[in-house]
Design a protein with these regions (language model features):
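Primarily mature extracellular domains of secreted and cell-surface proteins
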Residues: 48, 68, 75-76, 80-84, ...
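C-terminal motif of bacterial Sec signal peptides marking the signal peptidase cleavage site
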Residues: 26-30
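Short beta-strand edge/turn micro-motifs at domain boundaries
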Residues: 130-193, 253-261, 290-333
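N-terminal export and membrane-targeting signals
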Residues: 1-22
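Surface-exposed, charged secondary-structure patches
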Residues: 3-6, 89-136, 237-276
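Bacterial signal peptide processing site
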Residues: 32-35
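Intrinsically disordered, low-complexity segments enriched in Gly and acidic/Ser/Thr residues
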Residues: 216-301
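Core segments of small alpha/beta cavity-forming domains
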Residues: 40-92, 167-236
Length: 333
């Protein structure tokens, strides 16, 4: 469903002489050597980013055609890896011979939003057209060290008209926004907690979110579609995702706000008056542990991209642009 990333290829000619020059310069001036952990540098070379996207596409096509989750794990991580990995695992259980009718994913008309960053992990965004539909895909690639391969951690799907206007610095690089201490209405690192509080309590949980299908609409769907009956009761639980395993990332927009990618976790438990629970979805059955005598609980991960306004933008609220929720496991009791 998504694309994958290659190991960057770095030129090695004249490495020794360049290192020697850098050492002499630092000895004379007292500066520090420019490493990813010490200085503000581009997250990825402009020639390496396309190679990462190409590698991603190659591996994800192989993984999806063979239905091999171990291949998928080589190029995906975070929310995207959790959702796609579980999906491929389930489809493999139901189709162990693979997917011979799979149509390869291809990317085109790509631009790369590369921030300059200090320290690790590093990340960048590919904004690309794809062979699946007419929408734009935003893929966030990340890695924890120079020795690691780039892996995609987020996918967001936007109509061309939804793409915001990104800010750039004096050198043309995208401008990253930290997870805290910003001038935004909601700090990027707090979005998961604020959003899940809203889902549980409405405006009592948070008043930061604009009405829409993934906010007021989702709460209304839970109240109506899953209203309790004499035969079945449905319960929901929502919580922010681990900020290390599912790190949020954000880019500054020209209007002073930010585009933020973040992750949440969700549970839906259905308990029946008289069991056993009949599960008709083969993918749920493939991921099920335990015996659903009276109840089944679905565990899901959701990846979201939102526009967060500046705190000074009076009356503005957080707006959802895309949300992808996927089943990662299920249990019966």
């Amino acid at each position: 469903m998504t694309a994958r990333a290659p190991l960057p290829i770095r030129p090695r000619r004249r490495l020794s002489s360049l290192a020697a020059l850098a050492l002499l310069a630092c000895t004379a001036t007292g500066c520090v050597t420019v490493h990813g952990a010490d200085a503000v540098v581009p997250a990825v070379g402009k020639a390496d980013a396309p190679a990462a996207l190409d590698h991603f596409a190659q591996v994800v096509n192989d993984a999806d055609s063979k239905l091999d989750p171990s291949l998928n794990a080589q190029v995906e991580t975070g929310a995207l890896g959790a959702i796609d990995g579980a999906g491929i695992k389930a489809r493999h259980v139901n189709s162990p011979s693979g997917n011979p009718g799979y149509q390869p994913l291809r990317f085109s008309d790509t631009r790369f939003l590369i921030p300059r960053e200090r320290g690790w992990p590093k990340w960048f965004v590919a904004d690309t057209a794809n062979s699946r539909d007419r929408d734009r895909w935003l893929l966030v690639f990340t890695r924890d060290s120079v020795k690691d391969a780039w892996r995609a951690s987020y996918l967001s799907v936007l109509a061309p008209g939804q793409l915001p206007d990104f800010a750039t610095d004096g050198q043309g690089y995208a401008v990253p926004v930290p997870v805290g201490g910003t001038d935004l209405l909601v700090q990027p690192g707090e979005l998961g907690a604020r959003y899940t509080a809203y889902l549980q309590q409405g405006d009592k949980g948070s008043t930061a979110f604009a009405q829409g299908s993934q906010t007021s609409g989702l709460r209304a769907q839970r109240r109506t579609q899953y209203a309790p009956t004499s035969q079945v009761v449905t319960q929901f639980a929502d919580e922010p995702a681990d900020p290390v395993q599912y790190a949020p990332v954000a880019l500054r927009l020209r209007d002073g706000g930010a585009l933020v990618f973040f992750t949440t976790r969700h549970e839906m438990k259905q308990t029946v008056a008289k069991g056993p629970v009949v599960i008709k979805d083969p993918n749920v059955n493939a991921l099920l542990t335990g015996t659903p005598n009276r109840s089944v609980t679905l565990y899901k991960v959701a990846e979201q991209v939102v526009k967060v306004p500046a705190r000074s933008d009076a009356g503005a609220k957080v707006v959802f642009l895309n949300r992808i929720e996927g089943l990662v496991s299920a249990s019966g009791a």
